[in-house]
Amino acid sequence: PQDNTLIYFPTVVAIDKFIEQAHIQDQSLELDDNPILKDFVSWARREVHPQWSIIKALEKGFLVHHGQLPLGIRMLELSLFNNPDSHFSRLICTSTLLEGVNTSAKNIIITKPCRSYNKTFDAFDFYNLVGRTGRLYQHYLGVAHYIKTPQDPQYEKSAAVKSIEFELTDNSIDMDINFGNYSTHPEFVAVLNKLNITYEQYKSDIARKYRFSTVEFLLNNYYKYKSSLLDVLYQQNRNPNQSKLELIRVLCRILGMKEFNFKLNTFIINKLTYKYRQSIREVVDTTLQYYKNANLSDVINTTIRYKSSYIEFTFYSQVDLLRYFMECEQVSPSLISTLHERLMKNIEILYYLKSPSKKMLKDMGIYDGDIDNIIKVIGSDFSSVAELQSLLVRSYPKLNEISIVSKYVISGLIS
């Protein structure tokens, strides 16, 4: 059997391009012979898309691991890589593996020493990536292959000794705000005055959730697009049946979304914040009906990324800050309520932001489309992992109508 090998690419786009162009076919790999893989591919074709790059990779003998994939799928792919009986020996990955993920890899191939298109590794990151091999007590030494172009840097191990710095340094405005030393920062005082709030209010309502640079940026953009936002909310309030797409687009202008594919991306966000849950496949198919020239792989990846992390962790959080700005300015309560009812409430329900038990399942890797069905069987009377495990052990035989991804995660929890 081949030694396990990581193949590193800096971006998901680069991974998809490699998968599309790869002509390697491992004749010894028969997906139908592996019940887990057979079920996963069948589910992925229905839930995501038959042309999803992850399916193509599996058919060509590759596993894939990157941060845009839902957690449960990442866990499944990594488990297959570390299992010698799966016959998968090649895992394509991004810098997610720099975040402490251990594998059974003996080799790593570094195709480009970058975190993204323009963020070149320093020596610490480079050797951290090299150190992903030779772990899990499988190999005494790992082997790294660096595909170096004339423009790529030469790394010296002696330069990899780097002190760990906190994101908030002694010179940070956020640190000064936290300790009350803000008088030397007129830009912060200006924000307090614009919002007509005290330092104590800022510290309790804002500082714990947002960096000052984010607050300042969003506040400036809020003023820039305020009239458009209030106008759209007024129209939404008058006509509850009106599409919220224009509301999404004004909000994304304020949040600073890039112009490239702006209409396409906001269309996807709108679909992913409907009142009812849609599969990735449904969102992708509908999007392609309206944007016929869009790249299929880009639409799939964008939908997954927005659904898995962006809407919950960035979009909702920043829209909530805009709502706070509106309250500070004493905008009509009916318009603030409209923002919540037409958009924020949908996100809270769909992404389980107000349901601790469902959120726990999601954070453990359970696929979101299965969570409501699981709760129907086990109930929601648990607040710890131990209580959840006990309920899952008792109810596991009844959990038939869930995806292979969730079954895999649950089996790991109760084994």
Model regions and ranges:
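C-terminal accessory/interaction regions of large nucleic acid-associated machines
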Residues: 183-415
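Conserved C-terminal RecA-like helicase domain
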Residues: 2-90, 105, 115-133, 146, ...
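C-terminal or mid-to-C-terminal helical accessory/interaction module adjacent to the motor/catalytic core
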Residues: 164-192
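Short hydrophobic alpha-helical runs that function as membrane-insertion/retention elements
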Residues: 109-110
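Conserved segment of the helicase C-terminal RecA-like domain
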Residues: 114-116, 122-165
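Ser/Thr-glycine-rich phosphate-binding loops at phosphate-binding pockets of nucleotides
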Residues: 91-97
